[in-house]
Amino acid sequence: MSTAKLGCPKLRIMPLSIPSFPLPDARGRYGRFGGRYVPETLIPALDELEQAYEAAKQDPEFLDELDRLLREFVGRPNSLYLAERLTEHAGGAKIYLKREDQNFTGAHKINNCLAQALLAKRMGKQKIIAETGAGQHGVASATAAALLGLSCVVYMGEEDMRRQSLNVFRMQLLGAEVRPVTSGTATLKDATNEAIREWVTNVRDTFYILGSVVGPHPYPAMVRDFQSVIGEEVKVQLQEKEGRSVPDAIVACVGGGSNAIGIFAPFAYLPEGERPRLIGTEAAGHGVDTGMHAASVAWGRVGVLHGSMMYLMNDDEGQIVPPHSISAGLDYPGIGPEHCYYSVMGMAEYVPVTDAQALEGLQLLTRLEGIIPALESAHAISYAVQLARQMKPEEIVVVNLSGRGDKDVTEVMRLLEQSENKQAEGQEVKA
């Protein structure tokens, strides 16, 4: 029996036209943030990309094909799930999970990768390159490349390859070449550096699929637009479940910030008083006072990285301070320019969550709901429980569960065993 006969409304994945937002301005800026800080050789490529994107998002054929693939290949719409036992544990507001972990490839990254790969093919490019930290963007890029018949090279820090060996094999199985990066801290920032270097060299036939809302214009806007399907679905699904389209608060983890912007942006420009609290959880690592963290808003200063002005973790001489996070996907020393604008304008809050709190959040959701979240998402879960506890039962918190935790199980096992060994040693010393 069709959904039409059952009287169920069809939830279109992409609107008839991609949502338009007030920012960026014509120079690609969000207030003082964003812009294009790149070599002259890249300006024509960025202009070409911007023109191609503007044309594509007005093209019904492009939108219909993206809509079809998001439905039939990715599996959208995914669930807006009431976490009843987690809600009961918190003892306050209802906690809903936006289940990006249900997407094919296991995270929100595929929303953007599939769209950019379609754009690459439309532009006549034959090869895509990508950077990856946790490996999810790399897997999604390799998946989109395999689907559309494009070659794919993924740059990944050597340290992240160790932490995410399963995703490395997935990329290789999909036909991608994974190139290890050993420079710097051998993590996401360094992988991005190498990907940009290759793009500069091979810009004629190569398309760079940037995975987050960072980089030079038009990347932050383009990635936001492709990820905004998350927030647009929440509006429709919450209306069906609760009779209202706007929750009281939305919580999402933030590294560069693509999953967070995807759920924030459709709500961020609502008038004050109608806008929900938007809360991004940054990776506080061992604590923001230790220097071992990746909390760019809490600790950073304005600077330029990867072609964009943003809050950065830099020292008095302007040098990048190596970030740290238990999660490879949050291990980035900056945050996207639109998030910086939200913070300055008071449109969103950004709070630090430590490694230990994220591990607790992961175990809590796993044991109460049977859902193993990605370590990145666990930062948001941890804070959402604290937040819900302070709210009223009739209020609603939506958490963007940005990805599943399969990729992290080996690392979590190692960390928990390490913690247990330390506790045992401490008990023996006390004894």
Swiss-Prot record:
Keywords: Amino-acid biosynthesis, Aromatic amino acid biosynthesis, Lyase, Pyridoxal phosphate, Tryptophan biosynthesis. The gene is trpB. GO terms for cellular component: cytoplasm. Its EC number is 4.2.1.20. This is Tryptophan synthase beta chain. InterPro entries: Trp_synth_b_CS (IPR006653), Trp_synth_beta (IPR006654), Trp_synth_beta/beta-like (IPR023026), TrpB-like_PALP (IPR001926), TrpB-like_PALP_sf (IPR036052). The keyword Amino-acid biosynthesis applies. The beta subunit is responsible for the synthesis of L-tryptophan from indole and L-serine. One of its GO terms (biological process) is L-tryptophan biosynthetic process. SUPFAM superfamilies: Tryptophan synthase beta subunit-like PLP-dependent enzymes. Tetramer of two alpha and two beta chains. Belongs to the TrpB family. PROSITE patterns: TRP_SYNTHASE_BETA. The modification N6-(pyridoxal phosphate)lysine is found at residue 109. The lineage of its organism: Bacteria, Thermotogati, Deinococcota, Deinococci, Deinococcales. It is an enzyme of class 4 (lyase). It comes from Deinococcus radiodurans (strain ATCC 13939 / DSM 20539 / JCM 16871 / CCUG 27074 / LMG 4051 / NBRC 15346 / NCIMB 9279 / VKM B-1422 / R1).
